[in-house]
Amino acid sequence: MRQILLFAALAASLALLSGCTLSKAKADTAEDMADKAAYHKVSAEEAYEMMASQEVVVVDVRTREEYDGGHIENAVLVPNESIGSEMPEALPDKEATLLVYCRSGRRSKDAAQKLLALGYQSVYDFGGVIDWPYELVKEG
């Protein structure tokens, strides 16, 4: 009887220890993902350099009217208000490098954080178009 109790205690201890190890491994993986998908704030100049040197998706999170009034060339319009609990259709690749901007920087920060929460891995906020010293394109 004593051997059975000892064996049961040993088995329970092993089960608890292995459960803790698995939980820690899962937590470490979640932390690694969070580190990879961190919020990045960059200047307009840094964003411009990124556009020139690598493949990026420029995301304008202003309204349609603001976008039509002048936007960065090749920018994709994804209004901040439209970013919810589902991945925006205009941004199908969660691994793409996204450069997010708005008018002043408030909406771009909010949008960048929402995109990170949706699982996008490489999101850079470069603030507002009011600080963009380069050319804008107008629709029409």
What are these regions (language model features)?
Residues 2-8, 15-16, 20-45, 50, ...:
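Rhodanese-like catalytic fold shared by cysteine-dependent sulfurtransferases
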